[in-house]
């Protein structure tokens, strides 16, 4: 497919992406896009991603990892493409339920909390491993209680809603 056709197809096929989200969600995506678009040119490129990772404390991101992220897009990543990519990833998924289910695998008794040391071990040794800095940031933002437990239900609520449960 020629670049012109691909661009036309992308523009035509993505116009309904705005109907997939509520206005508040679109605004949140726009804020995220603006934060990631470090050079303010209206597109997210490799340098923007590297700068975003650095701002989040991940300074040793491999070029291959960034290349893979860029390759997920059908072309230059403007806001519409960014929104379309998230729409495809989130289609049909309730983020709160998805994250809760991931934690529930480690909580067969359904208590709603896990030992912080166990969470630390799992996040640094399994699948998409967190760095020590990422773990430290998480526990700084969501400290365990006095008995060393992490209230993952509240953590998930804050991640997905941006505020604590009443």
From Swiss-Prot:
The modification Phosphoserine is found at residues 14-15, 19. Coiled coil: none annotated. GO terms for cellular component: A band; actin cytoskeleton; cardiac myofibril; contractile muscle fiber; cytoplasm; cytoskeleton; myofibril; myosin complex. The modification N,N,N-trimethylserine is found at residue 2. Ca(2+) binds at residues 37, 39, 41, 48. InterPro entries: EF-hand-dom_pair (IPR011992), EF_Hand_1_Ca_BS (IPR018247), EF_hand_dom (IPR002048), Myosin_RLC (IPR050403). Residues 24-59, 94-129, 130-165 form the EF-hand domain. This is Myosin regulatory light chain 2, ventricular/cardiac muscle isoform. It comes from Rattus norvegicus (Rat).
């Amino acid at each position: 497919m020629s670049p012109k056709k691909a661009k036309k197809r992308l523009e035509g096929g993505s116009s309904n992406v705005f109907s997939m989200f509520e206005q508040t969600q679109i605004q949140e995506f726009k804020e995220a896009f603006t934060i990631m678009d470090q050079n303010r040119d209206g597109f997210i490129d490799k340098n923007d991603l590297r700068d975003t990772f650095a701002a989040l404390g991940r300074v040793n991101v491999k070029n291959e990892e960034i290349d893979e992220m860029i390759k997920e897009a059908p072309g230059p990543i403007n806001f519409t493409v960014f929104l379309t990519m998230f729409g495809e990833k989130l289609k049909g998924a309730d983020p709160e339920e998805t994250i809760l289910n991931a934690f529930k695998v480690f909580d067969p008794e359904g208590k709603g909390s896990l030992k912080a040391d166990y969470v630390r071990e799992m996040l640094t040794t399994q699948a998409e491993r967190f760095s020590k800095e990422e773990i430290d940031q998480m526990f700084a933002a969501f400290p365990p209680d006095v008995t060393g437990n992490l209230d993952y239900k509240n953590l998930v609520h804050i991640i997905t809603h941006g505020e604590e449960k009443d």
